Amino acid sequence: MIVRTWNLFHGNTVPPGKRRYVQEMVRLVTHDAPDFVCFQEVPPWALDQLEGWSGMHVFGQVAARPTIGPLPSTTELGRRLTDLHPGLFRSGFEGQANAILVTRERTILARYVLTLNSLGFRLREGRRLGLPLLTRLAWAKERRQCLAVRLDGGLVVSNLHATNARHPRVPDAEVARAAGWTLGLAGDEPCILAGDFNVDTARSVVIDHLDGFSNAGPGVDHILVRGASAGPYDRWTPERRRLGKLALSDHAPVEVVVE
């Protein structure tokens, strides 16, 4: 099984510009029919398009809803405002979503969602970790979630997008929570935990000690496997995601072959 994860950066490029390439990114990373693809930072309006662009089953969920300042907005208005300058506004108006794409050769039996930075969890972990007040307040700024699907045969695949915080214990806490949740869903069956962990192994005190999971690779984008054999990390070279003089996203896709 080919498993990939990619933070789409809202369809933006490096360097950022006034055009987005969400469709091009989705088609690029799914053109050779991988088994599973986990996306983070998907524009919410694009969720309805993913199935047509990829030819895969899709489970998507909006994590951060569209807003204009403190006021709620709509998906379409968020898109229109963001399209004025996507590289500048990013998710400021339209929010962001996550998605798991599954080959049509498999059947999704169940779908699950976990809010990683729920209020009770933040309060409890903030006290336990002794986090500064400003760090605790910032932790609540944007809802972060982990999605999971249960497939025919029992395999569970989870996709998380952890909080991007200066203090590495914040994403660590969310990663540990997502891992424990995934293990609980899977029971004795194999499971995969993929996504943008927003912390690398050099700063994390959690990633290398998750119960039963395979070793993480470099960077903040990871694919961890339990109960199956995982091949080496394949982090795409810049050339594989280049469009002219532009690099698609500020993250490279990561893939692992699972047997």
Positions of PLM-derived features:
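Metal-dependent phosphoester-hydrolase catalytic domains
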Residues: R106-Y112, P168-R169, A173-A176, G180-I192, ...
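Short, catalytically relevant binding-site loops at active-site mouths
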Residues: N117-G120, T163-H167, N198-D200
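Soluble or luminal CAZymes and related metallo-dependent hydrolases
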Residues: G17-E24, V42, F93, W139-R143, ...
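Short, glycine/charged-enriched secondary-structure capping and boundary segments
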Residues: K18-R20, E51-S54, S73-T74, D172-A173, ...
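Active-site beta-strand/loop signature of hydrolases that rely on acidic residues for catalysis
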Residues: V3-L8, M25-L50, L101, V149, ...
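Structured beta-strand-rich core segments of catalytic domains in phosphoester-bond hydrolases
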Residues: F36, V42-G153, T237-P238
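Active-site-proximal beta-strand elements of phosphoester/diester hydrolases
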Residues: M1-V14, Y112-T115, G154-N164
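Acidic/histidine-rich helix-loop elements
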Residues: T5-Y21, R122-L133, W139, R166-V170
